[in-house]
Amino acid sequence: MIFRQLFEPTSSAYTYLIGCEETREAALIDPVLETAERDLAAIRELGLTLKYTIETHIHADHVTGAAQLRDKTGSKAAVPEPSNADHADLAVREGEAIMIGKLRLEPLFTPGHTDDHYAYVLHGADGARVFTGDALMIDGCGRTDFQNGDAATLYRSVHDKIFALPDDALVYPGHDYQQRRVSSVGQERGRNPRLGGGKSVDEFVAIMAALNLPRPKKMDVAVPANLECGEVQAD
């Protein structure tokens, strides 16, 4: 497997490049418009063909690079079915794997940060990796106070879906504001200050209710654009 973790500094967002060594097909999870050219350069340098861009959810802090990458490569935009995004080529559903060459990416419906959120599990010879988007971060999680988010729902999603994976499954988050790169399911289950360490759903709901976070600066632009797979920004 070919794997790259790519960072976008303005929104502290991670994009993940996954490639099949045998077929040379590739996918990008959560590409960002401002770094789409960088991602495309990496794909070309590695001799890969971009088959899919894959969203974890409709983002509020950046615009997806899906449309721009599709225009340049013919890739397909895979978006969670509950997003109801215009111009999507593939509706992501739990139980329907996304094949990237010989690699099998398993979608997990993990609402709570937003009501359309998905995580993705990739099983390989070296174990499992889970791309958690904003559902689970390193020592944290995404907010639950917009886009039909719900703290109790997020708690159940993480505990029932992500924490059900093996302890040694690697956790690759959608963001990290300290540029930490990777954790594990066992580590987050044991010590995540919001969701781990045996915290109850009521404790988690209280933690999230007390955050009082500011509105994302790009939300009014990003959400409408992402509901069109970035087409508005790509035109």
Predicted features along the sequence, with ranges:
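Generic structural signal for helix capping and beta-alpha/helix-loop junctions
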Residues: 60, 85-87, 179
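Short, polar loop motifs at secondary-structure junctions
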Residues: 78-85
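Active-site metal-binding motif and surrounding structural segment of the metallo-beta-lactamase
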Residues: 35-78
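Accessory terminal helices/loops
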Residues: 156-170, 174-235
